[in-house]
A protein has these predicted regions:
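N-terminal amphipathic/basic-hydrophobic helices that include classical n-h-c signal peptides
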Residues: 1-19
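Short loop/beta submotifs within extracellular cysteine-rich repeat domains
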Residues: 49-50, 160-162
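A generic "binding-loop/recognition-motif" signal
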Residues: 156
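A contiguous pocket-lining binding segment that forms or flanks enzyme active sites
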Residues: 142-146
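Long, well-ordered alpha-helical scaffolding segments within enzyme catalytic domains
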Residues: 161-173
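N-terminal strand-loop-strand beta-hairpin
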Residues: 19-138, 170-203
Length: 203
């Protein structure tokens, strides 16, 4: 996700964030039938369903990149490959703020070779099924991973707060860990890389 906007209103723990090319989002853990309830409410309030995608995400890192708090990610979605750099920005609020630069690339193999020459190796792989909704000024996504179900809202902090109120989801558990950090906790190590993949049916 990207293009988060950085204005915030005061009150309820919400203030003002710096203006920069950042991704601003909030993640929630989903249990039981909450996803169906929220999707029903999104439809009722006129949200636009933008479809579902399957992703394979590979995280690359190095000692120096970890020290800077950054990661590089290659994401494959169908025939599309995206190269992304992210770095977490600390704040005193309950949303995640990250500097993000992303571009589409044509040759994933060449990008991997370039990253290797720069000293960046793959450390994590996780698969994800993502359904996306456009709701007012924010993007609402439902993510299924091998280790759980989550929802994210991305936009301005004002927009996120408004969506929480309209969808009546303030009771949901907020998740501060990123998907890479959750993969590190719940994934399995294979050939030196921690992986979290869906189980495949059949032989």
């Amino acid at each position: 996700m990207g293009n988060g906007r950085a204005s915030r209103k005061s009150g309820n723990g919400y203030g003002k964030l710096r203006s920069m090319p950042t991704e601003i989002e909030k993640k929630y853990r989903l249990t039981g039938g909450r996803r169906m309830e929220i999707e029903s409410e999104l439809r009722r309030q006129g949200a636009e369903y933008a479809g579902e995608e399957f992703e394979e995400n590979t995280i690359f890192s190095s000692d120096s990149l970890r020290a800077a708090g950054g990661i590089v990610r290659i994401r494959r979605v169908g025939e599309t490959t995206l190269l992304t750099y992210k770095r977490r920005v600390e704040n005193q609020f309950d949303v995640k703020e990250q500097i993000e630069h992303e571009t589409e690339v044509r040759d994933a193999g060449s990008i991997r070779s370039i990253l290797a020459e720069l000293g960046l190796g793959p450390i994590l792989v996780y698969e994800k099924r993502r359904s996306t909704w456009k709701f007012r000024s924010v993007e609402v996504v439902f993510d299924e991973l091998a280790f759980g179900s989550f929802m994210e809202i991305e936009g301005s902090v004002t927009g996120i707060r408004e969506a929480e109120l309209l969808l009546e989801i303030e009771d949901l558990e907020t998740v501060h860990e990123t998907y890479p950090s959750l993969t590190a906790q719940f994934g399995s190590r294979s050939n030196g890389i921690i992986e979290s993949r869906f189980q495949k049916n059949g032989p």
